[in-house]
Each structure stands twice: as C-alpha cells, then as structure tokens.
Amino acid sequence: MDLGLTGKSTIITGGSGGIGRGLVLGFAEEGANVVIATRDGQKGQEVADAAKDLPGDVIVVPTDVTNLEAVEEMVAKSASAFGPTDVLVNNAGGVFHPTPFLEKSVEDAEWEVNLNIWGVHHCTRTAGKGMVERGQGSIINITSNSALVPEAANQVAMYGGTKGFVQSFSMGLAYEWGPHGVRVNCVSPGWIVPHKEDHVGEGSFWRKYGYDFFGTPDQMADAAASGDANFNVSNQPIRRIGRPEDIADATLFFASDRSKHLTGQLVSVSGGSYMA
C-alpha cells in the first residue's frame, strides 16, 4: 500500500537508535526525506548509513531538543535540505534512571521534564508554526505505556507523568490546530526492544542499565516467548516483545493521509497490555 509519503519532509527526534532507528528506516523506506535530530550525531550517522539504499534521503542534524535555539537551527536546516516540514515525530525522550519516587533527586526529575516535556514543546512550537501557516501537517508524539498502565510506571512515576502531559498536550493542540489543517496524534509504545545491542547509543536506556538488568535483545525475546520474562509482558495477550518497526508502522499511518480524519488520538502498541 502506497502511503503517499514520498518526498515528504520529515523530522524525527531521537532518531539515533532503538525506536528512533525503526522510525527513520520506516519513513525512508516509504520515500520520505528524513532529518535525524539527535544529540548522538555519530550514532545518527550510522542510522543514516543504514538507510542509504532506501528511496528517501536521510541526513543528520546534531540537536539538543531541550535547547530552543538548537531546535530552531535544526528546523531551519531541515527546511533548507528538504523544504518546509510536513511531518514531525517527537520521539526523543527517556528515563534518567528507575528510582523510587522519594529517592529521586530534583535534578534527575528536572532532566526528565526538560527532555520529555520541553523537548516536545520546542520542536512542536518551531516546526508546527510553519504547518499552521501552510494549513497542513502531521505531528506524532511518541509517549509511553508508563502513562497508561500503573505497573509500567513502577519506579518511573515521574517519567510516566511527563508522558501523560504529552498525551494531554496532544489532545489540546489537536483541537486548537485542527481547523488549520494540522493533525496531532500519539503512539504509545509498550515493551519495545532493539534487534541488536549496538542499535542504540551510549546515552540510551538500554546502554545505561537496560541490558544489564533485562538481558540482551535475544534473551528478552526468548524470555517473553517462554513466559519467563522479568519485565512487563506477563499480561500481554500477544506474547512477544515489540520491535522498533511496530512503532514505525503505527507512526507511518498517522503521518499519512490514510489517517486524514484522525486527530487527537492515541494508539497503544503494546501487545494488548493496554486496551481502550
């Protein structure tokens, strides 16, 4: 099925690994031209290189999304390379470290707020301004099942709260910008695991503590299939781990005109661990 994304100017934040890698490759495969906005320029270039034989063009613009000036510069470079932004995927986000709430420092909490809330704000405000002016565009915010399923927010309550903000923000903005032709939707990942250990950068959740605690991607896949997993798949009707392309598929749908009558919506890509 042709999603009509060929030549669409697309910005994907946090596109250097994990879910971001899947998003970049998915959009490039559909012919979209992609800017990878990431702090890890080296890892971002590895993803761009992996996409070199796909129909869409991919470039890397090293960006700290918590810095408004850096975001404005990135959006300007994207426009120079591929034209005005058609699609924005706010994927950059993360947990500083799983910690019981009363033990979490204010500094660590602020890190999560800056990345997960202000990063989305800066990118949406900057790229969205042009969308509103042109009367078209699609914004997809990658949230988390930690904002939907209490078990998934265990020791990451602050992170789940920031993602809950993004959900509410998305609905409000969808209502405000709908008359201007701009749609805003959310994709909420469940347990999504990279295909390979080296598909993520040094600053990722997986590198910092995920692999040490949960095992390698292959080990997690085996544990989920056998029912022996020590992570949040025990209540999933679909007994497998999610992969980055699962998030990409849902995001591509929201980016395309196949979803042209959908805005303010959220889909949980979690094997059924959350149902609405």
Predicted segments with their positions:
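Short C-terminal tail/terminal secondary-structure segment
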Residues: D2, V95-P98, R240, A250-L252, ...
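Conserved glycine-rich cofactor-binding loop
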Residues: S16-G17, D40
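The beta1-alpha1 cofactor-binding region of Rossmann-like NAD(H)/NADP(H)-dependent oxidoreductases
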Residues: G41, P62-M74, V106, E245-D246
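A glycine/serine/threonine-rich, flexible loop-to-helix segment
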Residues: D49, P179, W191-N235
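Substrate-binding pocket helix/loop in short-chain dehydrogenase/reductase
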Residues: T99-F101, E107-V113, I139, N232
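Catalytic loop of short-chain dehydrogenase/reductase
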Residues: I140-F165, S170-P179, W191-V193
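Short, small/polar-rich loop/turn modules that mediate ligand/substrate recognition or access, typified
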Residues: G178, R183, L262-G264
